[in-house]
Swiss-Prot record:
This is Trigger factor. PROSITE patterns: FKBP_PPIASE (PS50059). It is found in: Cytoplasm. It comes from Maricaulis maris (strain MCS10). InterPro entries: PPIase_dom_sf, PPIase_FKBP_dom, Trig_fac, Trigger_fac_C, Trigger_fac_C_sf, Trigger_fac_ribosome-bd_bac, Trigger_fac_ribosome-bd_sf, Trigger_fact/SurA_dom_sf. GO terms for biological process: 'de novo' cotranslational protein folding; cell division; chaperone-mediated protein folding; protein transport; protein unfolding. Transmembrane segments: none annotated. Its main location: cytoplasm. One of its GO terms (molecular function) is ribosome binding.
Amino acid sequence: MNVIEKASEGLSRTYEIVIPADDLQARLAAKIEEIRPEVRLKGFRPGKVPTSHIRKMFGESIMGDLLNELVPDTTQKTLDEKKLRPASQPDISVTSEAKDVLAGKADFVFEIALEIMPDFEPADPAKLSVTRPVAEVEDAEVDEALERLANESREFAAKKGGKNAKAEDGDVVVIDFVGKLDGEVFEGGSAEDARVAIGDGAFIPGFEEQLLGAKVGEERELNVTFPEDYQAAQLAGKAAVFDVTVKGLESPQEAKVDDELAKRLGLENLDGLKDALKKRFAGEHGQQSRMKVKRDLLDKLDAEHKFDLPPKMVGAEFDNIWREVAHAIEQDQLEDEDKNKSEDELKSEYREIAERRVRLGLVLAEIGRRNNIDVTQEELSRAINQEAVKYPGQERQVVEFYQKNPNAVAQMRAPIYEEKVVDYILELADVTETTVSKEALYADEDEAPAKPAKKAVAKKKAPAKKAAAKSDDKPAAKKAPAKKAPAKKAAAKDEAPAKKPAAKKKAPAKKAAAKKDA
């Protein structure tokens, strides 16, 4: 085998591989001898078919099989000998005439074109300095949650005033209704004993408002228009009339924060409810703190590393992002600041995001590789099982999906690997804790107030990872700048959602047509 370097520019390499015809013929002869004892042909005793006859009958077919084995084998051998780490699957192109090669009249010649991984020295984690903002759970936060829970769980009773009572905002009106389009009753537009909480916004615009002032026994005709984006396409944008009969009026009772509230929520007493809320908020603050320190870390890593990126990797990442951006454009979901930008301007911004994602992905991968960080089978199995429980009754199908789809497993593995590398870096880095308010902790970088005095915690270990923590900073290969934009949160946010397996969650039961699309 002869290997000739045809091109070398930046991270691109092209090699020509030549396997001489004599070598191919020797391989063919060896293969024929290997299979000869098993060949069965009419007119010959088993295992006694002449080599020349086998070559004549099956030579080209056997040679084709040999070439199919040779291409990946020689490609890998070339990569190993040249000590190359491909950034993506090499492109293979055969340049010799297949007919002549199969007939043993020509050398087998093919080219390998590939992009290699950049060679760079990753930053020393011990020399990195990052900030971890932390916020304590305040009593006011718990009190606010208690009031909200009390209001949400309060009971309703028949409204005082008897037949003279009128429906007010916050009341529940019990009604029968029949919906009509152009005078005709439509499917799904009728219900009996429906409970309408005025002001909740659970029904289509105008429905609840027209019940204000209604009395028990009263009949009303409600004129409404279904939203243009209504879930039932046949009703979207259409005017409808609902004939309503009021059967009952209920008003909310006093919202009390007491032991009874806690018991209704499944806890022993009010103190237990307060403790549960504190733990929940502490967990949420911890997740947000983790996201912020990780974002700071990724920003520092991005600033520390400047090296050439494999064009195909960047192109593939950009294509993934742009598909979602294009969808956001079609749905008119771009942020106001982006709506007046040209397509070229938007593409330029998102290409920078793609480059950042790829750069950070390569940096974290290299740090992980050099420090023997890997994802164990136990960690992977745990993640798959956690995904499976999201699909009640279909857990087995989800697990089988991952067992049969290596790409899906790779998608599951990537964020786990990244979090382990981030944990490793944070254990060695100089982490400074900053006590901030809850508002500052959850504010975007461009909205955050001035930083308060810092409390240094040298080389403090990162907190334990939170289960199911949602973060705009994972995986790092999917990291976008801190710039806030709804479209960019969908298309360029730091984690592109993994594709769901074939087993889907069951759809909830359809609501009455009068209710708006959730």
